[in-house]
Amino acid sequence: MASNSLLRSSSNFFLGSHIIISSPTPKTTRKPSFPFSFVSRAKYQITRSSQDENSPNGKPNSPFSSQVALAAILLSSISSSPLALAVVDEPASPSVVIESQAVKPSTPSPLFIQNEILKAPSPKSSDLPEGSQWRYSEFLNAVKKGKVERVRFSKDGSVVQLTAVDNRRASVIVPNDPDLIDILAMNGVDISVSEGESSGNDLFTVIGNLIFPLLAFGGLFLLFRRAQGGPGGGPGGLGGPMDFGRSKSKFQEVPETGVSFADVAGADQAKLELQEVVDFLKNPDKYTALGAKIPKGCLLVGPPGTGKTLLARAVAGEAGVPFFSCAASEFVELFVGVGASRVRDLFEKAKSKAPCIVFIDEIDAVGRQRGAGMGGGNDEREQTINQLLTEMDGFSGNSGVIVLAATNRPDVLDSALLRPGRFDRQVTVDRPDVAGRVKILQVHSRGKALGKDVDFDKVARRTPGFTGADLQNLMNEAAILAARRELKEISKDEISDALERIIAGPEKKNAVVSEEKKRLVAYHEAGHALVGALMPEYDPVAKISIIPRGQAGGLTFFAPSEERLESGLYSRSYLENQMAVALGGRVAEEVIFGDENVTTGASNDFMQVSRVARQMIERFGFSKKIGQVAVGGPGGNPFMGQQMSSQKDYSMATADIVDAEVRELVEKAYKRATEIITTHIDILHKLAQLLIEKETVDGEEFMSLFIDGQAELYIS
């Protein structure tokens, strides 16, 4: 009866429908109560066409439906896996799944007791989160409730693609949870790892790993491509990033320096030497007929500002041949080997333009003695000078290339660079004499409005030791002062003020000086002037001033002898007088203000006195106890290829004698200055009072005090 009832209810349910018999969706029932192992997931479908054959009119055939239901129940009872019957009426209507759940019989039962429970549950999608992106907590809850069928991990394990029991798909970003795999396994979730798919993070990682190396290689490729294909061609093509291997010399096919030998004054001998080089380039037959060879190099040597570079520009303007010019500091830069490479490139260009002139300014930057410095060794500068030596007079020679170089440090140059065959001539460009300074002043006064009272001969005599650059600066400063004072022309006052500005610095006109300090400075400077005026064979006083200039509170100007400056020869009496004059300021302070009120204003004077006295004993042989012996070396400089410090070549006893002799010379000079000031203290008072009133006294006004006071020269 139970089976007939079941068949009747089933026949009413299945009539006019497609019947699909299949295994139920896994995880619909988490813990089945039957011991069967589910292997097959086959589906059995009884199509609607079978029903239609027995019901031509399309009406439900009750007997046939009953047979279909009976067949389904029979298949369910004998199958090793539970079956599901799906009935679909219309395509738009939802499918109904009828699940047959097997139960373990406790006692023998009729045929249909195994499948007596027939139900059609539908998964509750409301228990699952909405959307395609789940939170990690939602994912764990769904796994524990059996709502997740399978998961697929990304390569890096940061993202999980899941499939729920209702075939919904979602993704979860998972943290580094070591218990996740165990949880999934305990709940029977299928686990797999993605091989072909990647997460968004993986995509960015791949893009980053590919793009940045490609950009780097692309940049290097363009760099070297540009270097090889830039103007000039080859590595280091002109204008390319590899240009550091090429010379940076300036080339002029037809030099237009705007300077000729007519613009060079005060260096007649140097001009003559270089004019011969220019004439050799213009008229080579004149010299080759006599077997003469053109000099390969001329080295211009002289103090800074004497016109070495100006002479080179004049040579370029007069020669009429291609001219290359560069500074020696341009050879050596950041990379190793650049200096030698640039030297080679420079001479390759010069040889292609021969005959030509190559001018290297400040050659001591690369031409210093090799092996210089502590421990010797090799450096980039040595490679550069070695290449320069080879190019100037090496195996291949440099026919037709004349090298001009300038330096103010010939003592540090390598001896191999100075030998004949490289620099055949060393042209000394010295400081100009009086006549030379007059010519230089005339050159630099072109284009300037000068007053009628300007006498270049007097200016030249007041500027002994000035170089051409100093005189140019003098005239320029005078023009600036005239413009500042809103004058139409430059007078002798502007030139005189500019001269003092150059020597001692600008005046501190706004400096507040107390009367006490002004009186102290006036007596200090009057002491220098008084001792200097009464010393025989000493330089005459040119000007005395107590106006602060630079770091000096006052100054006394002496006009040095032109002959003494040019020759460099100083007598013993002159040096002794110089020490006495330097000590005159301290002596005047002691005589007027007392020993307790002397100041530190004489500190520079003491340094000068000590230097002169020690040189007289150690270098000039002016000591009877030491004799005609030079004590001690000149000192070494480790960066000039010399020793770090000179080794003493005398005993401690000799050193004590030197110290005693130096002290004796200083004491003697101090006594002479004291005697002069105490003897002519009245003139000291007059000069100091005049300085307090006028602040500046020139030499002629100062000498008038001696005439009025009938002072006599003090000769010791």
From Swiss-Prot:
Keyword presence, Membrane: yes
**Keyword Nucleus tagged:** no
Pfam families registered for this protein in UniProt: AAA, AAA_lid_3, Peptidase_M41
Instruction: Note the topology in the membrane.
Output: Single-pass membrane protein
Q: Mind telling me where the transit peptide is?
A: 1-48, 49-86
Its Enzyme Commission number(s) read: 3.4.24.-
Show the InterPro entries listed in the entry: AAA+_ATPase (IPR003593), AAA_lid_3 (IPR041569), ATPase_AAA_core (IPR003959), ATPase_AAA_CS (IPR003960), FtsH (IPR005936), P-loop_NTPase (IPR027417), Peptidase_M41 (IPR000642), Peptidase_M41-like (IPR037219)
Q: In which tissues is it expressed?
A: Ubiquitous.
Q: What PANTHER family has UniProt attached to this entry?
A: ATP-DEPENDENT ZINC METALLOPROTEASE FTSH 1, CHLOROPLASTIC-RELATED, METALLOPROTEASE M41 FTSH
Q: What is the designated name of this protein?
A: ATP-dependent zinc metalloprotease FTSH 1, chloroplastic
